[in-house]
Amino acid sequence: MNVPCCIPVALPLSQMRTAIQTAVEFNPANQFPLNSVPNPLHIAVLKTSYWGSAGVKLGVTFPQNTNSSVKAKILQYANMWSQHANISFAERSNGQVRISFTKGGGYWSYLGTDILSIKANQPTMNLEGFDVGNMPDSEWSRVVCHEFGHTLGMPHEHMRKEIVAGIDPEAAYSYFRSVAGWTKQMVQQQVLTPLDETLL
């Protein structure tokens, strides 16, 4: 059985320069060191997608016919971030955060200001199975807060060098193959490749 896992989505290389320019226009602190583009596998987790400290209000768009109680629950848990940061999320017809519920798509989100570079008719986040709304509150809290954390620009904390160094690669390959159907390449990208911490 494949359990949906979170996979932060990186922009394609063809969109990176535009995304960097947009991120720097939004927040000058997002300027890349030495004005260069890093490895595409690392781009999505860099401080260069940071919203900034002035605060931000992001609109959230749901697929047509999404149950109003599902929308309310997602916004409830997304807005838990407002207890810790100057951020808020509200439903909008043309939101920057565009949710899909694609079956087999798992859980994923683009990171930080990268969502501003995604075409308006494309999702920026997937919450597989959340459109039916029949899961415990603990799962709503865990997944929705986690994915909206990526939307705020936060990477996976397990990708720090000191944590990755303690992971048995063969055990990781076996585990993620059995629970999520991941290939060795996916495990390498999502679990065993440490972040360049100078860019965090």
Listing of model-derived features with the role each one plays in the protein:
Residues 1-200:
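Zinc-dependent metalloendopeptidases
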